[in-house]
Amino acid sequence: MLVMASPNHLVIVCGHGIWLGGPRHGHDEAEWLIESYKAGETPTFVEHIRAGLQVLADDEQAVIAFSGGPTRKETPLSEGRSYANLAAANGYFGLLQSGEDESGTVASQLHPRILVEEQALDSYYNILFSLVAFWRAHAVWPARMTIVSHAFKQSRLVDGHCGPDAIAFLPRTRIGFVGINPPNLPAEFGGTAPADDKKAVMQGAHDVLDHWAVDPHGVGSLLAGKRRGRNPWAIDQRLFAHEDERRRSGLQTRFVGGDMEALTEDGLRPWNEGPASD
């Protein structure tokens, strides 16, 4: 039986694709469902998973959230669930003790230090839904957070999404970041290859950063519209299942367009107020 220390550290691994399963345990790109421009990037996704598990292994009070909704019409499998499946299929890369039942066989349930977040449709909500999932599972808000994603997204994720105008997980010193870039990035993004086929996508990353700067909660028509376009399975975009849960969380939210829930601009951020009981 696994005994978990009282958790206070949330590790978030942001999903970028969907592992469909297979005998190579994610080490064959044919097992993945990804956009064409992400060709060659699936080894990086595996490294994100491994890196998140390493942070988890180094801190007995950490809990990891694999985050991402079912963004593809071809399968209802979510990014977050597929990442958790891949981690388990690879024996957690030897970094975590595997759960075993009384017969000594590997237990089928999720590892107790792993959360699967299956609603997020963009990077802002990777963080926000994961924070709520941590509170829901452990009845406290995390004191620290580590985000694992592409290195070139650090400014957007940490300074933007977690900054004072958005999620406001403060101060900045409470946030760690593990950045691992995919291959063949243009030189201005830390790569060494010309990667002409990726330049348009990377220019889009610049544009997205600008969009978030003027709409830090992603509630405007452009960013909210992108989320709707990534939601072929009509996954619920509310942060809380019911009003009582919302009240107990201490989080102040608003509804956007009738189908999404967002933080209020200047509302209480309970993760900055010390332990919050469920």
What feature does the model see in each segment?
Residues 1-122, 233-278:
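N-terminal beta-strand-loop-alpha-helix module at the start
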Residues 75-79, 125-129, 156-162:
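A short acidic (Asp/Glu
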Residues 7, 11, 20, 163-178:
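Protein-protein interaction regions
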Residues 113-138:
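Internal catalytic-core helix/loop-beta-alpha segment
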Residues 189-260:
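C-terminal capping/extension of enzyme domains
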Residues 65-67, 113-118, 144-150, 177-179:
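Extended hydrophobic secondary-structure segments that form protein cores and membrane-embedded regions
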Residues 168-204:
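Short, flexible loop segments at boundaries between secondary-structure elements
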Residues 135, 141-174:
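A contiguous pocket-lining binding segment that forms or flanks enzyme active sites
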